[in-house]
Amino acid sequence: MKNKFVELVEKSQLRTDLPEFNPGDSITVNLWIKEGDKQRIQAFKGFVLRKRNRGLHSAFTVRKMSSGVGVERTFQTHSPLIDSIIVEKRADVRRAKLYYMRGLTGKAARIKEKV
């Protein structure tokens, strides 16, 4: 069991402005990138490969294809570096973790869209 003070601090740091999304959904993650003394927003667009719900330590992995190479990036859900998350499409998948998508390309890698 966690300390009451730790629970209070963690609860104050949880973000409530992010939308609800699930594995398979196509999302765009806009995050702050610092280059030298400048800051800018960079978008990472792909589908959610997995989602880990652990309170303040929650994380999700987004996968995209870039020049024919699969790129995966894991984000901390409640990170202050995330500016916004935009859900592009909802997906209808039967698994919680879509690791099998790593080996698929082309038409085999399509995900059924939820209507």
UniProtKB/Swiss-Prot annotation:
Query: What does the protein in this record do?
Result: This protein is located at the 30S-50S ribosomal subunit interface and may play a role in the structure and function of the aminoacyl-tRNA binding site.
**InterPro entries tied to this protein:** Ribosomal_bL19 (IPR001857), Ribosomal_bL19_CS (IPR018257), Ribosomal_bL19_sf (IPR038657), Translation_prot_SH3-like_sf (IPR008991)
Q: Which Gene3D superfamilies does the entry mention?
A: 2.30.30.790
**What is a single molecular function from GO for this protein?**
structural constituent of ribosome
Q: Does the keyword Cell membrane apply?
A: no
Which Pfam family is one of this chain's hits? Ribosomal_L19
Cite the entry's keywords alphabetically: Ribonucleoprotein, Ribosomal protein
Protein name (database record): Large ribosomal subunit protein bL19
Any GO BP annotation: translation
Q: Which family does it belong to?
A: Belongs to the bacterial ribosomal protein bL19 family.
Superkingdom of this protein's organism: Bacteria
- GO CC terms on record? cytosolic large ribosomal subunit
Which organism is this protein's natural source?
Francisella tularensis subsp. tularensis (strain WY96-3418)
